[in-house]
């Protein structure tokens, strides 16, 4: 068995409520992803929803993270079984599912990552995740080593947070602050009191069901507040944001 992913250390850390500090990867480049993997983050999101990623760009990034202590988490573009199956086959074990609004959608996400009879994942006997058929116990181990994080970012999701958090196979609840702010009528203002109240409510309800919660918080004060509120897995920045900020600061140092 591949000791890099079995057992899934990120999944185990979440179950133990160990704080996991992460970073968002949106540059879609194996070199920048490799640098992130050397930085010491507990987890990294490789974004397939808003970043220009696909199967052909994800594979070299996974290769770049081989041996890194940072757990790769893929945000899928949509909660669709075929897309999820292909990402499983290339070697992802940790999934962030966007825009989950109901228990049924959460159940579909879980089922998409499990082989029958627990789920509906299609079977290929030779792919990158099982080292092209050379991992003898892959099928026996796979189902219990998948992490499913579902993203709540709408009013309906907030309304159904208890049912979503109680879904078997869901390992954590992730808040999408920007979309949630837009859904609550505060586009571009995730700091609005209504949005902050909703975020804290989601954290509290996740905790009530024994599930860890997470969020993207590139502003340090926000990240520390969310950790104080009980968030377990927090992405504290992005490669794109760090790169833009650092290059702008460097230019300003000499141009202004």
Curated annotation (Swiss-Prot):
Domain of life of the organism encoding this protein: Bacteria
Principal EC category: lyase
InterPro entries the UniProt entry points to: Aldolase/citrate-lyase_domain, GarL, HpcH-HpaI_aldolase, Pyrv/PenolPyrv_kinase-like_dom, Pyrv_kinase-like_dom_sf
Gene Ontology terms describing biological process: D-glucarate catabolic process; galactarate catabolic process
Annotated binding of substrate, by residue: 151, 178-179
Assigned keywords, A-Z: Lyase, Magnesium, Metal-binding
Keyword Glycoprotein included in the entry's annotation: no
Cofactor remark from the record: Binds 1 Mg(2+) ion per subunit.
Residue numbers marked as site, Increases basicity of active site His: 89
Family: Belongs to the HpcH/HpaI aldolase family. KDGluc aldolase subfamily.
Function field: Catalyzes the reversible retro-aldol cleavage of both 5-keto-4-deoxy-D-glucarate and 2-keto-3-deoxy-D-glucarate to pyruvate and tartronic semialdehyde. In vitro, can catalyze the aldolisation reaction between hydroxypyruvate (HPA) or pyruvate (PA) and D-glyceraldehyde (D-GA). The condensation of hydroxypyruvate and D-glyceraldehyde produces 2-dehydro-D-gluconate as the major product and 2-dehydro-D-galactonate. The condensation of pyruvate and D-glyceraldehyde produces 2-dehydro-3-deoxy-L-galactonate as the major product and 2-dehydro-3-deoxy-D-gluconate.
Protein name: 5-keto-4-deoxy-D-glucarate aldolase
Species assigned in the record: Escherichia coli O7:K1 (strain IAI39 / ExPEC)
Underlying gene: garL
């Amino acid at each position: 068995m591949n000791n890099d992913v079995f057992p899934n250390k990120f999944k185990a850390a979440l179950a133990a409520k160990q704080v996991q500090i992460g970073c968002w990867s949106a540059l879609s480049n194996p070199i920048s992803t490799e640098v992130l993997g050397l930085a010491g983050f507990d987890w990294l999101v490789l974004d397939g929803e808003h970043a220009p990623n696909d199967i052909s760009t994800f594979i070299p990034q996974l290769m770049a993270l081989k041996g890194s202590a940072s757990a790769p988490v893929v945000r899928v573009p949509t909660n669709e079984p075929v897309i999820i199956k292909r990402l499983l086959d290339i070697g992802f074990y940790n999934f962030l599912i966007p825009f989950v609004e109901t228990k049924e959608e959460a159940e579909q996400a879980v089922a998409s990552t499990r082989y029958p009879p627990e789920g509906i994942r299609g079977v290929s006997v030779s792919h990158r995740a099982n080292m092209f058929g050379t991992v003898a116990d892959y099928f026996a181990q796979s189902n219990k080593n998948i992490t499913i994080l579902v993203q709540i970012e709408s009013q309906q999701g907030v309304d159904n947070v208890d049912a979503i958090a109680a879904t078997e196979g869901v390992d954590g609840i992730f808040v999408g602050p920007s979309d949630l702010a837009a859904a609550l009528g505060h586009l571009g203002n995730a700091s609005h009191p209504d949005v902050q109240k909703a975020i804290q409510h989601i954290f509290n309800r996740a905790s009530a069901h024994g599930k860890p919660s997470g969020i993207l918080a590139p502003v340090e004060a926000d990240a520390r507040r969310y950790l104080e509120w009980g968030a377990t897995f927090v992405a504290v920045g992005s490669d794109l944001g760090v790169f833009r900020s650092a290059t702008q600061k460097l230019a300003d140092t000499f141009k202004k």
